[in-house]
Amino acid sequence: MRFTATAAALVASSIPATLGQHVRDLSNEKWTLSSDALNHTVPGNLPSHAHLDLLKAGVIDDPYHGLNDFNLRWIPESNWTYTTDKIKDLMPIEFCGKYVASTNNQYRQYSFDVSQILEGCNEDPILKIDFGSAPNIVNAIAEDRNSPVWPDGIQQTYEYPNRWFMRKEQSDFGWDWGPAFAPAGPWKPAYIVQLPKAQNIHVLNTDLDIYRKGQINHLPPDQSQPWVVNASIDFVGSLPPNPSMSIEFKDTKSGEILTSKRIGNVTVSGNSVTGVTVLGGVTPKLWWPLGLGDQNLYNITVTVTGHQNQTLAHVTKRTGFRTIFLNQRNITDAQLAQGIAPGANWHFEVNGHEFYAKGSNIIPPDAFWPRVTEARMARLFDAVVAGNQNMLRVWSSGIYLHDFIYDLADERGILLWSEFEFSDALYPVDDAFLDNIAAEVVYNVRRVNHHPSLALWAGGNEIESLMLPTVERKAPEEYAKYVGEYEKLYISLILPLVYQNTRSITYSPSSTTEGYLDVDLSAPVPMVERYHNTTPGSYYGDTDFYNYDSSVSFNSHVYPVGRFANEFGYHSMPSLQTWQQAVDPEDLHFNSTTVMLRNHHYPAGGTFTDNFHNTSLGMGEMTIAVQRYYPIPNKLDSVANFSAWCHATQLFQADMYKSEIQFYRRGSGMPERQLGSLYWQLEDIWQAPSWAGIEYGGRWKVLHYVSRDIYQRIIVSPFWNYTTGDLDLYVTSDLWESAKGKVNLTWLDLSGTPLPHNAGTPGSVPFNVGALNTTKIYSTNIKNLTLPNPKDAILVLSLSGEGHLPNSDKKTTFTHQNHFTPVFPKDLALVDPGLELSYNTKSKTFTVEAKSGVSLYTWLDYPADVVGYFDENAFVLLPGQKKEIGFTVQEDNTDGKWVQGVTVQSLWNQTLEK
């Protein structure tokens, strides 16, 4: 008999049993949770965390409430034991007084053979899984004289220190957007597997690699070559000599069989059986990211057989046919001739096509993964699709995402840039640590390789772009040493492991790099990074940019010019409704102790519970930004004033992201040939100030609505140099063919009256924008305009054009609206727009009308206990204009009564006392 488990959480393969196997899901057993910190036991669950079981038992309040991240520190600082008994033939980590094994990596899959222990067990078996205190363990490792010590000021501690010594979710120890619960417990399922004595196997993991013949990870695949399928199964048990393998591909929609054949070149190495076949003469329908084509998927069944065609293993996975390639090659002569600046590329190509990556960074959606459900993630990914995003960067260090999350991405066409779990720190490079990492890398690369949504493997977060420069600045005499350690871990160890287990995915050693100079897989350091070997006037790599000086937030000259933007942003407050989920009514004001201490920007840097100095800096950044650009809320009711301030911080955040995204998208037609914008960050882990566009629970901030608008296929954008007064209008398109149309320019005062002679600008301007490109359609200077009062003026830009979507012969009409004001919003001579809101019970849509003036930042809001999003929000509405808006309900706990609580406001409301 065999007991299969993954990491300290005891996760195991969930492949069904065959040929007399008996697989027992330990999630169905009765568990108890105990600790010296308690004087009694409570019911436990698997999977679970100690916090969740203590909450369910009524021992603690909601960990997310108030300052419970501080109040409940006794939980992560204690040891916990999960126990189950009265199960015959059960094999524990500690069983019948016998030690079975210890695990030290949350990210690995473990299996333990306990047959001999079972044979000698003369009592009722008890399975006991002990979880030590993660903060205490890493501190003990740090104090060991044999542990590495890094120069002062290098390692980034957010709350609990020394996280880099443990292969556990790094944000469990705290981050600048989340709490430090450091939870303990069996966070994934576990199983008991009993195999017959005859030759038999149980599948642990499956690697399905689908690529073009001759494809190599860092080189562009030849799209004319046939597809190759490499199927590899990891197992426990024993295979007979000379096993056979076969595959079958079946269309998930039609059920039509694409191909069914035996695989040749079957080899058995250790506990893996592998076969490779070329799909000659087979033309599958391709899988495309969102907006570029259909998400065609196939079920692939791999069967392993022995003598007399006896089935030994049978695995079915859902997959798709696509190539995805990160192009970091040098700029070619042909590109130079097109006006692209010299240097190196840094963009993605899918099925041989360049495309613009539009998206954000996803962080852990909860501090406690066992309560993250497929339905919850489906709602989040539906919001990603609704937000016109085709790529998410899966930030490290959270976890390697569950397969069901990749499944959701496969279905929706969301590319997942994935990373190994290292972030903002230097890590050990001793042999034991590297061996542990090697097993982690191999398991996870093989596990998710069949998903067409998988876009990239990156070595870690900001290691090359932040950590190495920090060493160079603070400990220059040790810079060479730590560059060597960086290359030892991320290039000499991880890169070959990736290449050995997939040919379909590119690897980059860090999330942000200047790219590579050379790749030689036979060299001790197989990838030579560029580092400082750059040439002025040339562009390389991707950018990671933050600037919390809000005085330059709308100055595009401070934005980095690069080939791809993988991180940028600014924090804001969540809405009142979200705060009310976690904060008592008396704490609902901007500078309350609870609100301030839930803000972890800037982090405490230790286990301090009085981080008022650092958090006040982050709160101050939001406050100053609002004061610089927007009407300052001053409502008589304290809760209403708090809500207005929260909303104001979201307005600034959204406008700043809009400015930066427009700049990056315009770069697609500039010398830098910029082809990607992934802002920080998609969603929240809890209710607190952060960079998120979607709050904990699913409510959209202003940011997600605005990014959805500016991520449309064809957009018109104003670029204003407020120092010189220059105003340029650009049209940007991410279509694969040219598009043409016109942009209407309409100058109005804020009462909605057209300005005489349209303020000296033409009423409309034609455009013809190239494929994946941008074009300037108009240029002027504010001084040349005939504006009676710049504070009482708005330019409304309305685009209408035609073009073809990628992989479509149908001509499509595209529209987009934008606006420009000659002064910042706080200086505008606002008027009451006289907003009216109605609801049509038949069409289930809302109608908003402005009766008396221009409505800026028109904002529809909905009450608590419902989750969803409006078709449009944060828009400009002109007098007499009616806009019909639908609402997508994702979750409703009000029995439809939420409709009665929908409200509408505009920037004008931010100036009112009530």
UniProtKB/Swiss-Prot annotation:
The keyword Secreted applies. Belongs to the glycosyl hydrolase 2 family. Beta-mannosidase A subfamily. The keyword Hydrolase applies. One of its GO terms (biological process) is glycoprotein catabolic process. GO terms for cellular component: extracellular region. It is found in: Secreted. The active site is at E462 (proton donor). InterPro entries: Beta-gal/glucu_dom_sf, Beta-mannosidase-like_N2, Beta-mannosidase_GH2, Beta-mannosidase_Ig, Galactose-bd-like_sf, Glyco_hydro_2_Ig-like, Glycoside_hydrolase_SF, Ig-like_fold. Residues 1-20 form the signal peptide. Its main location: secreted. It is an enzyme of class 3 (hydrolase). Keywords: Carbohydrate metabolism, Glycoprotein, Glycosidase, Hydrolase, Polysaccharide degradation, Secreted, Signal. Homodimer. It holds the Pfam family Glyco_hydro_2. It comes from the Eukaryota. This is Beta-mannosidase A. Glycans are attached at residues 39, 79, 230, 265, 299, 309, 330, 591, 614, 641, 721, 744, 773, 784, 909.
